[in-house]
């Protein structure tokens, strides 16, 4: 699946065989190279202790697919693989990536990853030298590359700088970013094509306004479709039709929307997302309110409503989970993490690691409170980018819907499913643990985790479907 996704994003942004490079396309830098998802303890940028077999069988096939698709860049990861940092690994960045796979683009390091080598290299300049000689062409935010003048008499460093500079200039030339007549040293031929891309054209081919308008409309349509395809019903199929009927029945009573994300949209968007216009912002609560008017009541933390509102409720929709929302002016640590995360800020995303994968902010307790207040059917909608323990949610709710990060049309997709207008065709992209201590659990574990723990007969709630 990861390999097919790599192929799709490269073809979509660069064109098949790089056909859109310099013609309105965007160069792709695939990340992260490699095995960053295997970090010890699930901690961002930590060591990946894996054998050669697992490295090649699990983590490198997407790299192969990306190179074959014509990706113009790769980003070396923060982590080390068996004690060798990825951005200081000549085997990974040169022998394997370029020598074995034939990659001809640029390699860049992740943010501050070069300077993180100081413990191994002994100094910031030495860190820059180690990364450069290993095969890193471009650094991000580092001081190490900016300190390479110290090695002006080092022939190996000078040769590596020339080599990396040529790669960067060739890439810029492919996109017409060099002055007219400038020659980067050689032309580049797109993979699978006999057409030569001129070097130093001094112009960028941009799509016409009509094409942009058409692409935006197509993207919105596809995004709406994908949001619906994210929906995965974890439990309560036998109750779903009855709940939908209660929602649609104007005489059935109020609809109460609760949970930390009841009136939130950012939770659907994932990590590193651009701000939305005010007119684009919606939520599950607002979508329900648009359809059913004043019947829909909001109680984010389970308070603020009269007891009669709860007793007369037709249904309760709890929007739970986590979020990758972070401030756009966040400072970042040397592992890419937001330096400060508010109490109700990001619980997922790059550098946002959790040692407790139960739902944050006492969301299980919120469901208990709701059950004390009403006997109305309770639907829990889980919006999350990580695998949380949902054991209590499943036990407490009449139905549980997993949504993941469905994008800006996520709230609409949830409500469409709630009222029975659409199906829920999704499949889990992750394996959900039944207990926090059962992690890691994987869909491709070679041995089943069933009946292994003395204190947990079944440590998994649901398995990924790939």
Kindly label every feature range from the protein language model.
Residues 1-463:
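Glycoside hydrolase catalytic-domain context in secreted enzymes
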């Amino acid at each position: 699946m990861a390999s097919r996704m790599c192929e799709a994003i490269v073809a979509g942004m660069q064109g098949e065989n790089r056909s859109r490079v310099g013609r309105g396309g965007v160069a792709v830098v695939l990340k992260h190279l490699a095995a960053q998802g295997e970090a010890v303890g699930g901690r961002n940028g930590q060591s990946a202790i894996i054998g050669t077999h697992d490295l090649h069988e699990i983590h490198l096939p997407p790299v192969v697919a990306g190179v074959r698709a014509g990706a113009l860049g790769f980003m070396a990861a923060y982590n080390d693989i068996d004690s060798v940092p990825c951005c200081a690994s000549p085997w990974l960045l040169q022998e394997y990536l370029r020598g074995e796979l034939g990659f001809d683009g640029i390699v860049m390091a992740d943010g501050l990853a070069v300077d993180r080598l100081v413990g191994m290299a002994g100094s910031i300049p030495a860190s820059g030298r180690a990364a450069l000689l290993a095969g890193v062409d471009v650094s991000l935010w580092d001081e190490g590359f900016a300190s390479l003048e110290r090695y002006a008499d080092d022939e190996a460093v000078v040769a590596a700088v020339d080599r990396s500079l040529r790669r960067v200039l060739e890439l810029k030339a492919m996109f017409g970013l060099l002055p007219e007549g400038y020659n980067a040293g050689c032309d580049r031929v797109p993979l699978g094509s006999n057409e030569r891309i001129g070097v130093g054209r001094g112009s960028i081919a941009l799509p016409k306004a009509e094409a942009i308008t058409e692409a935006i409309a197509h993207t919105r349509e596809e995004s709406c479709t994908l949001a619906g395809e994210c929906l995965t019903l974890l439990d309560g199929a036998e109750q779903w039709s009855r709940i939908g009927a209660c929602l649609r029945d104007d005489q059935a009573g109020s609809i109460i929307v609760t949970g930390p994300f009841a009136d939130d949209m950012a939770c659907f968007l994932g990590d590193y997302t651009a701000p939305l216009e005010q007119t684009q912002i919606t939520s599950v609560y607002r979508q329900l309110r648009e359809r059913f008017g004043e019947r829909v009541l909001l109680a984010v933390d389970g308070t603020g409503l009269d007891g009669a509102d709860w007793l007369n409720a037709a249904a309760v929709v709890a929007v739970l989970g986590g979020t990758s929302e972070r401030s756009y002016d966040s400072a970042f640590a040397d592992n890419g993490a937001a330096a400060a995360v508010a109490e109700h800020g990001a619980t997922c995303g790059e550098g946002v690691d959790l040692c407790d994968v139960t739902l944050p902010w006492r969301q299980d307790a919120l469901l208990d409170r709701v059950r004390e207040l009403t006997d109305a059917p309770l639907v829990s909608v889980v919006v999350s980018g990580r695998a949380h323990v949902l054991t209590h949610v499943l036990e407490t709710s009449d139905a549980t819907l997993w949504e993941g990060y469905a994008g800006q049309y996520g709230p609409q997709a949830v409500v469409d499913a709630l009222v029975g207008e659409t199906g829920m065709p999704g499949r889990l992209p992750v394996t959900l643990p039944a207990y926090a201590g059962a992690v890691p659990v994987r869909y491709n574990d070679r041995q089943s985790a069933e009946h292994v723990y003395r204190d947990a007969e079944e440590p998994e709630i649901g398995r990924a479907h790939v």
